[in-house]
Amino acid sequence: MKDPKFTHLYEMAKKELLEDILPFWEKYDVDEENGGFYGVVTREGMPVKGGTKCLVLNARLVWTFASAYRILKDEKYLKLAKRAYDYFCEYFIDKQYGGCYFMLDCKGNAIDDKKFVYGQAFAIYALSEYCRATGDTEARDKAVAIRDLLEQHAYTPDHPGYIEILARDWSYNPANQGSNINPEAEATKTMNTHLHLIEAYTGLLRVLRTPEQIAKVRQHLNIMLDKVYDSEIHHFKMFFRDDWSWTTPEISYGHDIEGTWLMTETAEVLGEKDMEEKSAPKCLAMAAACLEESILPDGSMIYEYNPVTRHINTNRSWWVQAETVVGFLNAWQMSGEQRFLDASLKAFEYIDLFVVDHEYGEWFTMLG
């Protein structure tokens, strides 16, 4: 018998997806003038003239509509997925050097052609899911091509991991490294990029189960568990030098709770008992630390904490609240501990009350 709280959470989430989120993008974001989807729309759903088109958003659109079609079997989502995929392949993929541009203008011209590894990860993730949903192996081949470029140019074998930024031609400039989430941080390697790389490589493993891909996913999981995860405090470190020595003490609770379910998923897809046994206790410990340290009485999760200065960033970001729901739900499924399901449900109730824009649709970006 299913837990009634889980059933309630499931029904709320399903309603939000099918009656708010997906319809908003279908109704307001299709760019009939320039192709693909608008980069920016107003709260009311009006396109912002001249709005740029970002690699991360467009990759996520490919992933979202492909995933929606795979699960819901509704042909309208296949049509939207194909629209997103076709635009992505035509305009974001660099035909000369490979990989993907980071930013386009509204007409599809590259205005930031750097190869952010974080962005390439989203491209692999999107193309892999499109293949998984449609059976189109050409999408998988495109994902593999990007993976191979990352392995050739971004991977650092002396201290296994991946650098942050390369030029359009994949050349590397040590002075041009930094975090996409905090440009001021000293960072050759970051938690955020590696978190999305493990997500991307796991997605590719679902459609490319080769010894090479299995080995890379195993390595990614070990990097997250051994280098990024701090077993003393049960949190991720965020910013690192090339040798994996960390540079700043901040804790990002949203990334932590996101990491708990992503690493669980990776271990499950990998299907190796020793990696599941290594990953599970660390994921649960981090979920417990997030629950104890970052959840406010209303069920929301704070953004960030610096244990040295004791500064707390209490802003409530949309994505942090979404990851709170998923991460605590995963922790409940792993452990059976009711406190995690309660926290997941309360986080979604907070989202429904404050984050969802019930007047115009979709979600607010940030709450104070």
Task: List where the protein language model places each region.
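Glycan-recognition and catalytic cores of secretory/periplasmic carbohydrate-active enzymes
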Residues: 1-368
